[in-house]
């Protein structure tokens, strides 16, 4: 019995021990789970997150430190601040309240910085405006960058001597945090431009990869403009003068000539010793070649960079012996200026209608830039605004085209010439060997000659884009009686060239009409046959700023009696764009046009432009032209023209575009003529 009682007691004790052990294990497990939960809670608790250093400093500067629980803690001082409600014209400047302005009067004329919610700063100048301190230069950029509108509430706090923080509150009374990128003009510094020039002593210059990419892009653009084949595009020919020769061409006189697409020429630099010994070398140190066949033989060779010590013999080219080149002893400067034109004659780069052999007896124009021929320029490209688009382009400082040699009467039927290339002013590619004739000759012309075109105000856009005016070549319009025999045969060439110019101008009109669309074609009224015109004269135009040189009409008595009208624009008779409009009621100050006007380079297609209208009395009137999808016409200035010309409702006005380079119209009133 005693043994049986002991056994249950032992089991009971073991059971109690096991229960105590389980309880302890449960307590330990619960403690571990609580620790894990606390750790997770610390990580996910948003109140435990810490702000970055910049945000903390900015918050402390604006709102101050958090108040401590101790009563002895010093209260945080409030920053000086003021607010402004955006009303009225606030975009240009903003007035600072007078009580706050008194504290910063010593900062007048200095710059302060406005800092937004993201820490970006804008520099603004303080200035006095009507005895009131205001934010001036730079405030407009801050308003535009943050898109501040009328009715918004701005709070300015001065956190430093010249730094203000700005809080923007929208109309909804909530703070608006506008994220704006830093302006490019503030973050980027202007890089100094690299000066480029010709290397001295034929030294090689290192070219970066960026320059190579830019040159390739420019080359592709030139190929698209001039329709050149990239495979036929060669490097320009350079004329190098030996450093050991007596005359040394300056860097500014060295010209780069565009070689023909199907030829490449080699430029050879000749040592000074060989140049002095051999009489076949000219004063420039270049070996002369008697015929052009030697140049064609060297077309397979490429441009070679020469060294002074090399003794290889490569074919070279220079100016022909028969060309009119001045000696270096008399006029060295003119000889340097004559070389580029002579190279043009030798390479055959003139117009296709002009023969190369005629270039041998040509005189070269002084002080003329021949890097790119004028008539070969594309007048529709972007950079065409850099040249003058008027007759003044052909009038240089020299006595090449003297204005006193021409007549000054509008109805003159003859052309007065001094034998010094008046044909260059007309852009007619006629060549002549009569260069020594300095006498005044009269050429009778009538207004009934077919193909002849009268000239008073030259329109450069009417010149053919692929024609090179032989500047420096003595082109003259021959006289049947006074001119020599070798000039008489060129009479027919003039008429044929004028017909070609008119045909090209007429074809360009058709291309413009196809671009305008069927809507504009239906509204356009223009004559298909060119008017009969006469070759008159060219006089020096004094063009005022803002007024283009417009063509003038012959309003003589013979015209009023039924005579034919004489157009005075070069090759614009077939290219003139005309349309007729019936005069609206006198109380209508605007005038709607039936078609859109052409778009000038560097101008928007739909915008406002100032045009110049010329009435029958040769008075110029500026009008404001507006082009929108729904309206196309004059919105200002037409009322004055209608009133001064006594136009009545129902009269017909004929508008004619006189120049494509500058928008200028001429108003013709048939009822008044």
Swiss-Prot record:
Note the InterPro entries from the entry. Answer: B3_DNA-bd (IPR003340), DNA-bd_pseudobarrel_sf (IPR015300), REM_fam (IPR039218)
Chief location category:
nucleus
Q: Where does this protein reside within or beyond the cell?
A: Nucleus
Annotated Gene Ontology cellular components are: nucleus
* Region described as Disordered: 1-44, 315-337
Q: Which SMART domains match?
A: B3
Residue ranges, compositional bias (Basic and acidic residues): 1-34, 328-337
Keywords attached to this Swiss-Prot or TrEMBL record, sorted alphabetically, are: DNA-binding, Nucleus, Repeat, Transcription, Transcription regulation
- Residue intervals annotated as DNA-binding region are 79-172, 576-671
Among the GO molecular function terms of this UniProt record, one is:
DNA binding
Source domain of life is: Eukaryota
From the Swiss-Prot or TrEMBL record, give the protein name.
B3 domain-containing protein Os01g0905400
Q: What is the lineage of its organism?
A: Eukaryota, Viridiplantae, Streptophyta, Embryophyta, Tracheophyta
